Amino acid sequence: MKLGIVGLPNVGKSTIFNALTGGSAGAANYPFCTIEPNVGIVPVPDPRLDKLCEIYSPDKVTPAVIEFVDIAGLVKGASQGEGLGNKFLSHIREVDAIIHVVRCFNDGEIVHVSGEIGPARDIETINLELVLSDIDLVERRIDRCKKAAKGGDKKPLAEAALFERLNEWLGEGKSARNFPCTEEEKELIADCPLLSNKPVIYVANLSEADFAGDLNENPLYRQVLEIAEAEGSRVVPICGKIEEELSQMEPEDRQMFLEELGLHQSGLDRLVTAGYDLLGLISFLTAGKPEVRAWTITKGTKAPQAAGKIHTDFERGFIRAEVIAFDDMKACGTMAAAKAKGLVRSEGKEYVMKDGDIVNFLFNV
């Protein structure tokens, strides 16, 4: 699963990506300094692993990870090929969700492509380019449905009517993800790889001074928040400069710096966690002396399929899963104490995994 970082040029995308990944994507003061997308694998913050390490003192610790892609800055007219538009849009098509970085800071040394800071306008510019790209796809889908309906089949005719409604919606500059429709219609639309149908998190990139102030009183941040609330999306406020500094510190110094700022968690840790949730992902845990590990699965995954994430033999020969909730394990301190209290459950093939389940899979092949 991939999260694509998008935004206009010079909004801080590459600075944020570099802080996330410890990489060195181009972060120069001009458009298109990132042309081919940079890809980074980022660990998902999970304090539960720290607690399990206290209990087991493992030889190895492996967190869950998520993939971030830094996509070059979009510009107005990208859907018609302006800038390096078509190439950039194709990169966005390959990701599962969008991290939309919005500039909410003033800095005379960093040019803004529009000449002045305007978060609402910038969001509209990016969203409109995605919508315009989608209109072309939807119109082609309508044509195919109508051709298929000539044989008298009513199903493609109904599908054509749905996509005509969607086309009108897109024609008003509205994103497909906010299109009012039934669950069945959503599934049909999901078959069409629409850019504006991808879930989104808005990142409000603030100056150090504004980040330390009252965000509710910040007019630039409020512009982002109001748009996100209207479409049911999330906003993660961060300061790219602070995150860049944090990324270069040792863990102990980083924690001290966060405490000085009055923060429990960095903005980027909050972004990674929000992205994981946006993709519908959860983690189950395995724990022992050799390794403590978080495994990524989608919400709704059943126990045998979760076992298959570890090894295909675990799924093929699944017998049952011994499961304890993390909070119960934390309270007991050891697996032996948890078993003595009857907190370790035996679950079968229909068990739906929960976030934070600590599991031992029993299998036979």
Model-inferred region functions:
Residues 24-32, 39-41, 49, 58, ...:
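Generic secondary-structure boundary/loop-capping signal
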Residues 40-45, 72-82, 93-154, 169-182, ...:
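Conserved Switch II/interswitch segment of TRAFAC-class P-loop GTPases
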Residues 1-111, 139-140, 144-145:
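Conserved G1/Walker A P-loop phosphate-binding module
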Residues 32, 46-49, 62-68, 82-96, ...:
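Amphipathic alpha-helical transducer elements in NTP-driven molecular machines
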Residues 22, 54, 90, 128, ...:
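Short, intrinsically disordered, mixed-charge
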Residues 2-6, 11, 17, 144-352, ...:
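C-terminal-of-GTPase-core extension/linker across diverse P-loop GTPases
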Residues 6, 32, 37-40, 47-49, ...:
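Short capping/connector residues at structural and topological boundaries
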